[in-house]
């Protein structure tokens, strides 16, 4: 039986909030089978839980938020959610003493290392996957995103940025997903933004944690970070990272092929909601026999330590 995963032990880290610029303490806790992914704000009394749920997602200019029925929100969940998807973590309590997850370096890599430091434990309960039975596509003008049946998980993402720093040849990326390929090829790709946008937001008391330490910053001509890019196609790789996190908002790894053109958080979420709304287009499956599990989800040795 392919089993659900959680953490072996509690781990903690501190970082800066993108919105407030203030220190945030992040605590990751193991959770029992079928708990799912739960984000928790401990700065509120009593603490407020936000189960990962496609319908709770709100897209803002800066990040992805989860919002409950009382309009209480937790922000900047997308990069940690991508790390959970990448390592196939089914059950976890994510606590922060702030309204947001810390931005760290703007990628998912610090979260991957934190999760691996905690260690990953299998639970005696079958892991559920969302498997596509029919193709589902959403569009908005020239932007679109699609999930289609495929016995594995692939992502094919194209961006269309007219900018001197983003070469035309580095605007499309294809990934045959596995935990290894996610960690090596996607998790280190950082979020990006324009210097003028960051300055404007900070003048209005927003994005106070935004800096060269947590994003690729560009002006009209070039990348301003002294160290440059981690990959020549880091921009599109980060958009793929975002998509992996967005599509995991249902709490289950997806068996299917994802293709997108100029998609972002809102479009990715619209696609996930469209899939879930069409009950004939998908099914939840478990695997008693590991031989039948798509290669994409075989547990690599570095994860199951």
Swiss-Prot record:
Hydrolase in keyword set: yes
Keyword Nuclease: no
Matching Pfam families: LpxC (PF03331)
Keywords per UniProt: Hydrolase, Lipid A biosynthesis, Lipid biosynthesis, Lipid metabolism, Metal-binding, Zinc
GO MF annotation, one: metal ion binding
Required cofactor(s): Zn(2+)
One GO CC annotation: membrane
UniProt EC number: 3.5.1.108
EC category name: hydrolase
Gene3D superfamilies, sorted: lpxc deacetylase, domain 1, lpxc deacetylase, domain 2
Source species, domain of life: Bacteria
Catalytic residue positions: 265
Catalyses which reaction(s): a UDP-3-O-[(3R)-3-hydroxyacyl]-N-acetyl-alpha-D-glucosamine + H2O = a UDP-3-O-[(3R)-3-hydroxyacyl]-alpha-D-glucosamine + acetate
GO process annotations (BP): lipid A biosynthetic process
Protein name listed in UniProt: UDP-3-O-acyl-N-acetylglucosamine deacetylase
Organism for this UniProt entry: Sodalis glossinidius (strain morsitans)
């Amino acid at each position: 039986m392919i089993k659900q995963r959680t953490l072996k032990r509690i781990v903690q880290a501190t970082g800066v909030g993108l919105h407030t610029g203030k220190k945030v303490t992040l605590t990751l806790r193991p959770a029992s089978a079928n708990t799912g992914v739960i984000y928790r704000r401990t700065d509120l009394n009593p603490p407020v839980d936000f189960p990962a749920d496609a319908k709770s997602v709100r897209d803002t200019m800066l990040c992805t938020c989860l919002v409950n029925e009382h309009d209480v929100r937790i922000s900047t969940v997308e990069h940690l959610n991508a790390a959970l998807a990448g390592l196939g973590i089914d059950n976890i309590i994510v606590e922060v003493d702030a309204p947001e997850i810390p931005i760290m370096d703007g990628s998912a890599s610090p979260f991957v290392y934190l999760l691996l430091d905690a260690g990953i434990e299998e639970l005696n309960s079958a892991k559920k996957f969302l498997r596509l039975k029919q193709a589902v596509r959403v569009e908005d003008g020239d932007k679109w995103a699609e999930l289609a049946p495929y016995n594995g998980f692939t992502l094919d993402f194209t961006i269309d940025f007219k900018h001197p720093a983003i070469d035309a040849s580095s605007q499309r990326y294809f990934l045959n997903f596995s935990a290894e390929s996610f960690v090596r090829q996607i998790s280190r790709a950082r979020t990006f933004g324009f210097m003028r946008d960051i300055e404007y937001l900070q003048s209005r008391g927003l994005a106070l944690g935004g800096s060269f330490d947590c994003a690729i910053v560009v002006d009209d001509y070039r990348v301003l970070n002294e160290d440059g890019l981690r990959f020549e196609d880091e921009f599109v790789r980060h958009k793929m990272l975002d998509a992996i996190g967005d599509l995991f908002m249902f709490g289950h790894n997806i068996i299917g092929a994802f293709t997108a053109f100029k998609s972002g958080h809102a479009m990715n979420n619209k696609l996930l909601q469209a899939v879930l709304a069409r009950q004939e287009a998908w099914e939840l499956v478990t695997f008693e026999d590991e031989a039948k599990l798509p290669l994409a989800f075989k547990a690599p040795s570095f994860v199951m330590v």
